[in-house]
Amino acid sequence: MSRFQRVAVLGSTGSIGESTLDVIARHPEQLAVFALSAHSRIERLAEQAAASAAAVVVVPDAAARQRFLAAWPAGRTPPEIRVGAQALADTAADAACDTVMAAIVGAAGLPAALAAAQAGKRVLLANKEALVAAGALFMRAVRANGAELLPIDSEHNAIFQCLPHEGRASAPEQPARGVRRLILTASGGPFRRHDPLDLHEVTPDQACAHPNWSMGRKISVDSATMLNKGLEVIEAHWLFAMPPERIEVLIHPQSVVHSMVEYDDGSVLAQLGQPDMRTPISYGLGFPERLASGVGPLDLARWGRLEFETPDLRRFPCLQLAFDALRAGQAACVALNAANEVAVDAFLSGRLRYTWISRVIAAALEWQQRQSSVTLDSLADVLALDAATRAYAGNLGLA
């Protein structure tokens, strides 16, 4: 990495955002914070902005702006405060910004991620919805505007590192030459050994108790259901131009092998490392060079053994639903994601049983298939279908 980079961290108070700021702080000679954004943890945003000397912060509304100013250290000049969703997209495209960490969870992060791609930025993509809900649209924007796309999910980042170097960050339209298949690994979450019949009474706290990773509550539930892995299958399809029949999922409880690439000659390349998101984040920030991340060395002798197994689709029906949606097309993927967000929100707030998350998604996919054909040629088209699916899922009487 030869040039100095000013980074916008969108979703800075989440786990990815916090880890990103940790890595940036380790390399003041190469990286600086341009902008930060948060939705609800405004006091933490003020702490981050003060510590990182951010030039800009983005908050959702006027009330959040007042909260930010109230939390700002007395006697210090505050950063520029921008307000609203359009301000978020404008900040992602700002000429003063070189790199955008797109780490806002959910469909709310899609417009800003797309704006960054359209502005030709280096996009560090941690927001799944940009590809799950708008894969074709997003990849076209990357190609048309000369943006760089570096996946930050540990699995996709691992695959990226194991692929041939040519064109990896430029939204390829064909699978990399010589690659037979992609193998995504999954921890299996907290219920890997549970009988499916015992999952009916699962509580939100149980679902959020991930054995290996420290994550937010929504993504922790997605990991427990393996819908998260299903979304990653869809992402891998778009990131690496790989058809679904050449993408496989394996449960790997130790979360040491982050994913693998199998080549036509039978070789399998894997990326291993500690389960710490600072590794893929530092890779994205430093690409094509490598930066120190603060992650300790991997002691394979301590691990002793690494296990792999095929996922049980009776225990993880959401994974099968994701493959079904990918084969059905982009509209089904939009419906899958929207229905899951509604269902997980209902589960976390105590309005839906854990085992009904997959039922809400399945019902939404059936509903989407009954609709007249839709075109998803613009962000407005995607967001309209997203909203319609949310309304349908919310009216099921299940959420």
Swiss-Prot record:
NCBIfam families (alphabetical): Dxr, PRK12464.1
Alphabetical list of Gene3D superfamilies matching this protein: 1.10.1740.10, NAD(P)-binding Rossmann-like Domain (3.40.50.720)
Catalytic activity: 2-C-methyl-D-erythritol 4-phosphate + NADP(+) = 1-deoxy-D-xylulose 5-phosphate + NADPH + H(+)
Gene Ontology biological process: isopentenyl diphosphate biosynthetic process, methylerythritol 4-phosphate pathway involved in terpenoid biosynthetic process
SUPFAM superfamilies the record matches: 1-deoxy-D-xylulose-5-phosphate reductoisomerase, C-terminal domain, Glyceraldehyde-3-phosphate dehydrogenase-like, C-terminal domain, NAD(P)-binding Rossmann-fold domains
Protein name: 1-deoxy-D-xylulose 5-phosphate reductoisomerase
EC number, as in UniProt: 1.1.1.267
Enzyme class at the top of the EC tree: oxidoreductase
InterPro entries: DXP_reductoisomerase (IPR003821), DXP_reductoisomerase_C (IPR013644), DXP_reductoisomerase_N (IPR013512), DXPR_C (IPR026877), DXPR_C_sf (IPR036169), NAD(P)-bd_dom_sf (IPR036291)
Family per similarity comment: Belongs to the DXR family.
